[in-house]
Each structure stands twice: as structure tokens, then as C-alpha cells.
Amino acid sequence: LDEATDHVLYATLEDDMVENSRIYELRDEDGTPYVVSVLDNQRHFAGYLNQIWQLIRLSGVAVRHDRSAISANHHHYAMMLGVHDLGLTTLRPYGVADSSESSVLVLHESPKATPCDVQGMTDADMRHLMRYINTAHRRGFTHRNITQNALARLDDGTLFLCGWQNGDYASGSTNVALDKVELLSLFATVFGVERTVAAAREAWGDATLINLIPFVQKAAVPAATRALPGWDKTLLEQLRKTMSALAPEEVSESLEQVTLSRFNARSFFAITLLVIAVGVVLTQMKPNEMIKA
């Protein structure tokens, strides 16, 4: 289902990756340009279904579920303002307004963001993004969807994370850990495990990496990262092994994997088919006639 929703949901950097929005250009009477992002309830529904799927799929993880476009846009606006107030780079939101079942998010056109050439990133760039997200985490902000598409640069080359719509504030330790694992798994897929862990040791320290080991598992990695050319089934095992080497032996042996996934898509569909099969059998048995008998 994760892979399927990737084809249903589309987003652009112009409005900080609002899923399925309509984009317009606007100039005020002074000629100042703005980006106008309109999100309709009907278009937001696919994003809402994806949130619900994550809520069902993940255990012990807080997941947003914004039923309306208005709720989603208001939250996104608040997130961007909050991240900006931390001194972190974001696109500049101007305001938000609602009309019927649609919500309008207005952003300053400048500075503009462009997709980051991930292959061209340096170790310093990796450390910069790791410290960026760590600053957000210290104040309770989590992104919750760190993929290659969330990495962007401003006109002056400043590297930052975009797409805060599904993030949240007052986040718990599990969501903080998952953010870091999303970033680690992305970098490990693109740059390799050794290079990624070396950068993370400088940015976060060994203690943080050791505490992340129980969360390094497939359920924590976005489908978009698992679709990258550098991904393979052994990558997370290599990442856990390299991170475990940082811990004393007695600590490493005591670190048990946290249960994040209630079930996978295969078991979900198997349960669905089982329910359908039971329904068919019961129908064929004609329960009404059995009751009368």
C-alpha cells in the first residue's frame, strides 16, 4: 500500500510538498510575487487514507490523521512557522485562509527551493542535515517523512528539509528516533553504511546512535527510500551491525528490537481474504434457514 500511495500522491517544492494541491502564482498591487497553494477536501482524501494506513500499520508511533484539507493546511502552516522560529531554514509562509471545503496556503515566492542533487552531497552536507533535524528534535518537532524528495536547497545553496505537512510538534521519543532512522537509512542507501555512520558519529555522537539500534528496521524506512537503486535487503543488517560495534558488548547484546509494525501488507491482505472467505462460506451455509430449523 505504501508503494501504491506514492503514485496517487504528488507534491512540489513550491508549497513545501503539500500533497495533491493546486498551485497558482499571485502578485499583489506592489508587484510582490507569492505562491498560492489550494488544497481541496477531495484531493486531500488520498493523503488522509495514507495517514490512516500508517496509523493502522505502526504500533506505538504517533501518526497525524487530518480528516479535512483545512485541518491539514492549518497544521502545515503552524509547523513551518515553528520550524522557522527555531532558526532553521524553511520556505516562508505568508498566511492561510479557508473557503468552503478548500484551504489556501500562501507563501512568499522568494527564496525559491530546488531539489537537492543527493549524489552530489558531501560529508559536510550530511552532517549539516543531521544537525538540522537534531535541532528540531530538541524542541519536539519531527518531520516523519524524510526521503530523498524532502531534501532541498535554496537559491544560495542552503541545504534544508522541506515537506513538514505530516510532521508534528510535542513529539515523543519514538517519533524522534524514527526521524533519525529515516535519515540514516536514506544516507546509507545513497552513500554507504560506513560513510553514513561516520558522519552521524560527528553530528549526533555514539550514545545517540546506540540508542537508535532497536529502531533500525524495515518498518521505519519509507517506501521511497527502499525504491532507490542503492537499497538492498541486507542494508539495515549492515547498518545495525556497524552501529552495534560502537556499544560495549554487554550493552549491544541487551538491545532488543522495538516492535513497530503490527503487520505487513501481505498479512493485511491475507486477513482480508480470510474474512471474505469466511463470509462466503457462511452465506453458502444459509444461516437463516439453519436458524429456522
Feature-to-residue mapping (PLM):
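Membrane-interface helix termini and inter-helical loops of multi-pass transporters
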Residues: 285-292
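Conserved kinase catalytic-core helix
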Residues: 73-90, 114-149
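C-lobe/activation-segment region of protein kinase-like
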Residues: 143, 154-226
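Conserved ATP-binding subdomain of kinase catalytic cores across diverse folds
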Residues: 19-106, 138
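Regulatory N- and C-terminal appendages and interdomain linkers associated
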Residues: 1-17, 30, 220-283
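Internal hydrophobic scaffold segments of catalytic domains
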Residues: 10-42, 186-215
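Soluble, non-transmembrane catalytic domains of enzymes that act on hydrophobic metabolites at membranes
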Residues: 7-13, 109-111, 115-117, 169-170, ...
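Structured N-terminal alpha/beta-domain signature
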Residues: 23-26, 36, 93, 107-115, ...
